[in-house]
């Protein structure tokens, strides 16, 4: 059983809670195959408001567009299948993950499908590098908040989601204290984006992660 809570910045509140379970399907000395099933509950705000300056140079209080909300109050089913293989210092893997909203309010971010494939190579007993490719297909926002009426493209639910292809180069290092402690650093670069409507494209990003294995 695992659980995750996401806290985006600079918002000082957590946006999601995701308890999930891993189910071992098959495991040999050469490879592992397991499934994941879980629920993701959006616990962030979906009605954040603030003061803006309109085109008439007047201040007004509005409800922020969807992209500036930290949650949509929905509950989603998370399902995934992961395959991992080891061979003489090399590692290979693939994962397919699906997110489907099953309990919705007046609007929710679109369902998504994510596919990952990766290869890794041990440099030493403690250090390894990895190369990963990712495909993300996300549907537009479902529903609408009739109070979100700002004259910007992000107020249109159709201008969300789309398809994104990314590559990522990472380094992983075991840390000396305890057992199964690992730190990972990864550079993610979008290589192709087919987005719905006018949107700001994703830029490159850096991920820093800590992993504890039992």
Annotated model-derived regions:
Residues 2-97, 101, 154-156:
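Outer-membrane pore/translocation modules
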Residues 104, 109-214:
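Outer membrane beta-barrel transmembrane domains
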């Amino acid at each position: 059983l695992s659980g995750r809570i996401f806290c985006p910045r600079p918002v000082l509140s957590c946006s999601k809670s995701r308890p999930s379970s891993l189910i071992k399907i098959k495991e040999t000395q050469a490879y592992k195959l397991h499934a994941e099933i879980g629920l993701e509950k959006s616990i962030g705000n979906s009605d954040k408001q603030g003061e803006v300056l309109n085109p008439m140079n007047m201040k007004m209080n509005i409800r922020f567009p969807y992209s500036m909300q930290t949650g949509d109050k929905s509950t989603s089913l998370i399902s995934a299948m992961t395959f991992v293989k080891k061979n003489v210092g090399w590692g290979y893997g693939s994962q397919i993950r699906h997110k489907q909203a099953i309990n919705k309010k007046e609007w929710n971010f679109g369902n998504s499908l994510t596919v990952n494939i990766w290869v890794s190579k041990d440099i030493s007993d403690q250090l390894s590098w990895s190369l990963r490719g990712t495909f993300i297909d996300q549907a537009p926002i479902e529903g609408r908040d009739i109070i979100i009426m700002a004259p910007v493209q992000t107020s249109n639910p159709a201008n969300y989601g789309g398809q994104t292809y990314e590559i990522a180069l990472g380094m992983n290092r075991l840390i000396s204290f305890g057992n199964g402690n690992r730190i990972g650093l990864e550079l993610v670069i979008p290589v192709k984006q087919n987005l719905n409507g006018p949107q700001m494209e994703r830029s490159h990003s850096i991920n820093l992660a800590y992993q504890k294995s039992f």
